[in-house]
A protein has these predicted regions:
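Core beta-strand elements of the Rossmann-like FAD/NAD(P) dinucleotide-binding domain
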Residues: 7-9, 194-202
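Central helical "cap/lid" subdomain
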Residues: 200-243
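Active-site lid/adjacent beta-loop-alpha segment flanking the redox-cofactor pocket in flavoenzymes
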Residues: 220-223, 236-343
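Dinucleotide-binding Rossmann-like beta1-alpha1 core, especially the glycine-rich loop
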Residues: 53-131, 251-256, 260-264, 289
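Helix-loop-beta segment of a Rossmann-like dinucleotide-binding subdomain
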Residues: 6, 86-95, 109, 129-168, ...
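Helical element adjacent to the flavin cofactor pocket in flavoenzyme catalytic cores
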Residues: 148-198
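Glycine-rich FAD pyrophosphate-binding loop
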Residues: 29-47
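Conserved small/polar residues in nucleotide/adenosyl-binding loops
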Residues: 368-375
Length: 375
């Protein structure tokens, strides 16, 4: 990367994770000129690099479901378009219920999915082992299987988006931190960076867990905070198949996926832990970073995982991971123009499901900014 950056641009995207690269890709592909993306360190170095990479199609609303489906189709098309690998495999997802209330919720999801032509199979208890042979179903009452869900490589997708964005004319500058966002009369004027100032008409802030503190410097409030997020990666299992579906066990706060012959066990625990003492002060140099292990916090969930997948009892832990993820109070994404500053847009707050959301979120940011440009 050259340190010589342009002095002006139409739009500056701040953040080189999967969300920022998706925004840059969509803007450039659909005709925006002078698109610049700035990344303080390397692409994916914030939280994208350690994401589990699950790709689910059903969201909590029609809008989120459409965004997720767009993401899935985009990632498939990008492989064909570029010949580069995104690591996408549609091995399906199995979600189980251990209570009748949960089963009723899953059945509602299956009905909801029909509106979007998403294939969902409702399963009786005795059908679940046919889908997931390693599972203990003693306490399971039923479930749903979504054949075209799957998983992908977050770094691979980001790199493909970045390369495609550059093919369409966007410029990407790594190791170029933003010192200050410049405003005038309540509107965006530009950015002051490590390598000089850039005048621009629009800014899209896609800086993940840094977004809150960056926006706070220009008195824009973004309700987002980083929590600790845990998973473990097992040693290889002989019994595991590469086509093993993603498994979700909401009653036990678990998700599991096959990972190169191993099993990744992640949790969304009821009482999460703040990742940093001051959520306005995420360290600027926190790149490819990990947080201290807290096995006592994770252990009860690991025990539940071993009950669910007994094969885990006889295999070691290759990696214990604790890293930050950005969450919002209502678990909704933060997308669109801020009320405080004109032409200042945000694309963040994906609540640890950024991989399956980023493709659609980038398209939404394109639509928002294009509408503004047409006014």
């Amino acid at each position: 990367m050259s340190n010589k950056i342009p002095t002006s641009a139409k739009v500056v995207v701040i953040g080189g994770g999967i969300a920022g690269c998706s925004v840059a890709y969509h803007l450039a592909k659909f005709g925006w000129k002078d698109v610049i993306l700035l990344e303080r360190d390397q692409l994916t170095s914030g939280t994208t690099w350690h994401a589990a990479g699950l790709i689910g199609q059903i969201g909590a609303s029609a809008t989120i479901t459409k965004l997720r489906n767009y993401s899935l189709n985009l990632y498939k098309d990008l492989e064909k378009e570029t010949g580069l690998a995104t690591g996408l495999k549609q091995n399906g997802s199995l979600t189980i219920a251990t209570t009748n209330d949960r089963l009723e919720e899953l059945k509602r999801q299956a009905t909801f999915a029909q509106r979007f032509n998403i294939e969902v199979n409702e399963l009786e208890k005795n059908q679940i082992k046919d889908i997931y042979s390693l599972i203990n179903t003693d306490d399971v009452v039923g479930g749903i299987f979504i054949p075209k869900d799957g998983q992908a490589d977050p770094v691979g997708i980001t790199n493909v988006l970045a390369k495609s964005a550059k093919m369409y004319g966007a410029q990407i500058f790594e190791h170029c931190s933003v010192n200050k966002i410049l405003t005038k009369n309540g509107s965006i004027e530009g950015v002051d960076t490590k390598h000089g100032k850039i005048k621009c008409e629009y800014i899209v802030l896609a800086s993940g867990m840094w977004s809150r503190q960056i926006a706070n410097e220009i008195n824009v409030s973004i309700p987002l905070y980083p929590n600790e997020h845990f998973y473990i990666l097992s040693e290889p299992l002989k019994e595991i198949s590469k086509s093993l579906p993603v498994l979700r066990d909401y009653n036990n706060c678990l998700y599991l996926k096959e990972d190169a012959g191993k099993i990744l066990v992640g949790i969304f625990e009821p009482k999460a832990k703040p990742a940093f003492t001051d959520t306005y002060k995420v360290p600027n140099d926190f790149s490819f970073g990990e947080l201290p292990e807290d096995f006592d916090h994770f252990e009860p969930h690991l025990k539940n995982a071993m009950k669910r997948i007994p094969a885990l009892e006889n295999v070691g832990i290759r990696k214990f991971f604790n890293g930050p993820e950005a969450f919002t109070p209502d678990t909704n994404y933060l997308l669109g123009e801020t009320p405080e500053i004109k032409n200042f847009y945000v694309c963040c707050g994906f609540n640890s499901i950024g991989i399956q959301s980023a493709g659609g979120a980038g398209k939404v940011c394109l639509l928002y900014t294009s509408d503004a440009a047409d006014d």
